[in-house]
Amino acid sequence: VQMYILHNLFDCTYTMLGDFNQTLCPESSKILQNNLDKILDEKSIYVELNKTYRSSRQIVEFYNKVGNKTNVNYVSRDGEPVEFVKTQKDSEIGVLQDLIAKYKAKGYNSIAIITKTNKQASVLAEQFEKAGISINLIDDNTDKYNNDVCIISIYNSKGLEFDGVIVYNVGEDYSSDIDKNLLYIACTRALHKLTLTCNEKEFSKLIID
């Protein structure tokens, strides 16, 4: 509907950019792609851009496995292996704090703990605060980020990048195709180092299958 309105208001050419693996409404994206010629009343040209300049080889190879039919190429830049860390709920703040310290020791300035939901981000920030640890919570009301350690939801992390990323508690809560897209978004935020944690019995089948 939005493209139809724009096309009728402004008689010009359009360039549309997007990543199907980062959409949170997969059906809407498919409908748009399949009907674009009808909406614009003319033939559209589809160009696939599949080279990333952001992440290291190890990170790209990992999220290629997570994404739906993803085959992203990368600039040849080696980095550290993707890390998987099991935690216990009663001690995970300490584990996360240790991971942050290791990231800082490697010279990573911008570090994000990425949660699945805004509520998870808020609860986790409160747990850090109760432990006497100062950490930035980026939510819908945040208008500035000081390039330090932060807690942020996947939705709010879209479009951002960080030296190091810790994806929080990738357990059985990640199971659907939309969850696969969410996980892909989280992992593609990382430039140099990516760690996934889990405080449940097993990591999500989306990453172990």
Residue ranges and their predicted role:
Residues 1-209:
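Conserved helicase motor core of SF1/SF2 NTP-dependent helicases
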